[in-house]
């Protein structure tokens, strides 16, 4: 069986101040563009966000489950779940479907009392903590752009600019990615969302 290419691209960058998540907005299936306004970054709590590449049905299911589990945790413990704990919970959920894996890769980024953290998970739940990550069909292009330009001393504004330029680079080359950029910046105060829409030409 050949390698499955998960459509779309999402990336994450960690700095000392927080985390930046970014994705493009194109939704494709079997060569067709189904939407030019798909949301691939979702906030689970006020301080944890997730970015996805893959099938939108699996993405929406996981977002609902994670939000429910995070809310239950907050009600039981009186505080938000930690980023690492949410990533481990997602790992268990994905692994439980290992015989029929969900067709999605996930970036988890957040800020808690331990500071900023960033994780990448594959379809069967392998979880790795990283300083910068990319998932989906444009992952290699994104990492090729980010790697020589990233350093841990970046400020959030610089990381935001790097993330946007990385996604733009992917969109220029990857037909499964396109149409705009969703951006989320997470720090100790919460999160800010931004959207960049590309105008159609021709």
Curated annotation (Swiss-Prot):
Pfam families associated with the record: Proteasome
InterPro entries registered for this protein in UniProt: Ntn_hydrolases_N, Pept_T1A_Psome_bsu_arc, Pept_T1A_subB, Proteasome_sua/b, Proteasome_suB-type
Gene Ontology MF term list: threonine-type endopeptidase activity
SS bond partners: none
Positions annotated as propeptide: 1-8
Active-site feature positions: 9
Catalysed transformations (reactions): Cleavage of peptide bonds with very broad specificity
Regulation of activity: The formation of the proteasomal ATPase PAN-20S proteasome complex, via the docking of the C-termini of PAN into the intersubunit pockets in the alpha-rings, triggers opening of the gate for substrate entry. Interconversion between the open-gate and close-gate conformations leads to a dynamic regulation of the 20S proteasome proteolysis activity.
Transmembrane segments annotated in the record for this chain: none
Keywords, in A-Z order: Autocatalytic cleavage, Cytoplasm, Hydrolase, Protease, Proteasome, Threonine protease, Zymogen
An individual GO BP term: proteasomal protein catabolic process
EC number(s) from the headed UniProt entry: 3.4.25.1
Main location: cytoplasm
One term under GO cellular component: cytoplasm
Subcellular localization, as worded in the UniProt entry: Cytoplasm
UniProt family annotation: Belongs to the peptidase T1B family.
Subunit composition and interactions: The 20S proteasome core is composed of 14 alpha and 14 beta subunits that assemble into four stacked heptameric rings, resulting in a barrel-shaped structure. The two inner rings, each composed of seven catalytic beta subunits, are sandwiched by two outer rings, each composed of seven alpha subunits. The catalytic chamber with the active sites is on the inside of the barrel. Has a gated structure, the ends of the cylinder being occluded by the N-termini of the alpha-subunits. Is capped at one or both ends by the proteasome regulatory ATPase, PAN.
Job of this protein: Component of the proteasome core, a large protease complex with broad specificity involved in protein degradation.
Descriptive protein name: Proteasome subunit beta 1
Organism: Desulfurococcus amylolyticus (strain DSM 18924 / JCM 16383 / VKM B-2413 / 1221n)
């Amino acid at each position: 069986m050949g390698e499955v290419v998960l459509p779309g691209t999402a990336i994450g960058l960690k700095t000392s101040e927080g985390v930046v998540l970014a994705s493009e907005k194109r939704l494709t299936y079997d060569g067709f563009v189904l939407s030019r306004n798909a949301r691939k970054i979702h906030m689970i709590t006020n301080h944890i966000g997730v970015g996805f590449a893959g099938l939108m049905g699996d993405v929406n299911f996981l977002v609902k489950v994670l939000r429910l589990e995070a809310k239950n945790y907050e009600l039981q413990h009186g505080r938000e779940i930690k980023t690492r704990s949410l990533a481990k919970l997602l790992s268990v959920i994905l692994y439980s479907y290992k015989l029929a894996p969900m067709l999605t890769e996930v970036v988890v980024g957040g800020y808690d009392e331990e500071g900023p953290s960033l994780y990448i998970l594959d379809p069967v739940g392998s979880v790795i903590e990283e300083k910068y990550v990319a998932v989906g069909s444009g992952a290699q292009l994104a990492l090729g752009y980010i790697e020589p330009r990233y350093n841990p001393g970046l400020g959030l504004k610089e990381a935001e600019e790097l993330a946007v330029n990385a996604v733009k680079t992917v969109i220029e080359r990857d037909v499964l990615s396109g149409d705009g950029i969703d951006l989320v910046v997470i720090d100790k105060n919460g999160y800010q969302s931004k959207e960049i829409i590309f105008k159609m030409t021709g």
